[in-house]
């Protein structure tokens, strides 16, 4: 094993934990995704081990690591912390270095982040009060329909007669879905209707600039959402190679910039120590 510095980004969401390992040339050389569960620290350690093995690297070669996301303060090996808004923006701008709007559909929340042509944040909106339009919403609906979550994208693509749902609310939508089943509506048509609900919920949050990027685990596992969004917006959307990893990649990019100096960024963007 050749010794060389590597940089680690850890994004602990309420649903999934993601780790990205970059080399000094900012190339992604290792990554892993797992359920966050009820022990964020253990999830981070597990993903780190898998990521380092993929990168053919050891813990001793980690020059710096930054944590982000809901559980960022539960990562014992992190040398610094950054907010998820900063890291998602950083990760997306790495792949699309121009003025962009970012749609991030996560397990428990949705985010829209706007960056200027220099990568500076010019605005953002986040939906944290309700699970509607998130991965948790689709997970609940898949349980109601008694179908595996991973099969929803394929089913939506089979739809020939979309069934629109009248409610964004997870609780009311569950009742409405059961009623549609009772009426004899086909499952693929209902699933496509659920996808439409997710898209409408996100797009109503904020207006978007011409170059729009879609990221998040929901996008990674349900690429048909991107196709439907493009049809609704009437233009092509940008999707990074690893849409679920943008936050972790952004954190690793900050690790490259910051080095081993500890830094804890607060929610308002201020730092206890200079990054």
Identify what each model region corresponds to.
Residues 70, 203-232, 243-244:
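Glycine-rich phosphate-binding loops at beta-strand->alpha-helix junctions
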Residues 40, 118-161, 165-166, 253:
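Glycine-rich phosphate-binding loop plus the immediately following alpha-helix
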Residues 138, 240-275:
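Glycine-rich phosphate-binding/hydrolytic loop that grips phosphoryl groups
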Residues 3-42, 46, 121-129:
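Short glycine-rich, Thr/Ser-proximal phosphate-binding strand/loop in the N-terminal lobe
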Residues 84-85, 230-249:
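Conserved phosphate-binding/catalytic loops in two-lobed NTP-binding clefts
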Residues 84-144:
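Glycine-rich phosphate-binding loop of actin/hexokinase-like ATP-binding domains
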């Amino acid at each position: 094993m050749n010794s060389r510095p590597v940089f680690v980004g850890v994004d602990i969401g309420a649903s999934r934990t993601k780790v990205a390992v970059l080399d000094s040339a900012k190339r992604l050389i290792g990554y892993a995704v797992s359920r966050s569960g009820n022990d964020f620290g253990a999830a981070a350690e597990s993903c780190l081990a898998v990521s380092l093995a993929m990168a053919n690297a050891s813990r001793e070669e980690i020059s710096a690591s930054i944590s982000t996301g809901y559980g960022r303060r539960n990562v014992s090996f992190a040398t610094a912390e950054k907010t998820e808004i900063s890291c998602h923006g950083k990760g997306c701008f790495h792949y699309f270095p121009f003025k962009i709007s970012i749609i991030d559909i996560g397990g428990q929340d949705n985010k829209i982040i706007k960056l200027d042509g220099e990568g500076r944040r010019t605005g953002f909106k986040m939906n944290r009060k309700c699970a509607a339009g998130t991965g948790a919403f689709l997970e609940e609906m898949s349980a109601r329909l008694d179908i595996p979550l991973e099969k929803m994208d394929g089913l939506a693509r089979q739809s020939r007669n979309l069934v629109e749902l009248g409610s964004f609310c997870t609780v009311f939508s569950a009742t409405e879905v059961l009623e549609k089943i009772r009426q004899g509506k086909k499952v693929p048509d209902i699933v496509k209707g659920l996808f439409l609900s997710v898209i409408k919920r996100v797009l109503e949050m904020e207006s978007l600039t011409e170059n729009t990027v879609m990221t998040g685990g929901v996008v990674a596992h349900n690429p048909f959402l991107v196709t439907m969004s493009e049809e609704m917006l009437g233009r092509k959307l940008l999707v990074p190679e690893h849409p679920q990893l943008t936050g972790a990649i952004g954190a690793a990019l900050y690790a490259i910039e910051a080095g081993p100096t500890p830094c804890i960024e607060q929610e308002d963007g201020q730092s206890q120590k200079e990054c």
